[in-house]
């Protein structure tokens, strides 16, 4: 994993404790307990919200706050006759960050969405980008890379992605904790007001 300065590696229970503390749901006095009589399981609701928050963070937060790995050795690459490379993305990759094929003169950091107007020129042999101005289209489970010169093998120099930790933990930069929604306990969907 890259960019590990000030990175936290938290279990789900450790992250749950952070959320409870930020929301004021953790007693501050040792020996005190909080009990509910309405049957609401606050921990389950917080865990669900916590998982949603982390999934959203992986999809949209700046990559310097998230676990980023080079997955180039885990890609399945296929090249078409027209030089377009299809890369099958490994399941832990949430989103691509920076990719580069060996012959390219620069890397790609903007990944177009299928159907975007900018993709129209990519499939035309006369307007398709080459090694000086490469392009990529992100289909989620596969990425099309435009394009490779004739006779070149599809060899990746890098395929950096934001990755989801396989063990269900939370890996993130400590400053990302500031994005936890802590307005008040009632603002979390489905949580009753705590008195």
Language-model-detected regions and their locations in the chain:
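Glycine-enriched, solvent-exposed interface loops adjoining structured elements
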Residues: 2-133, 137-139, 145-195
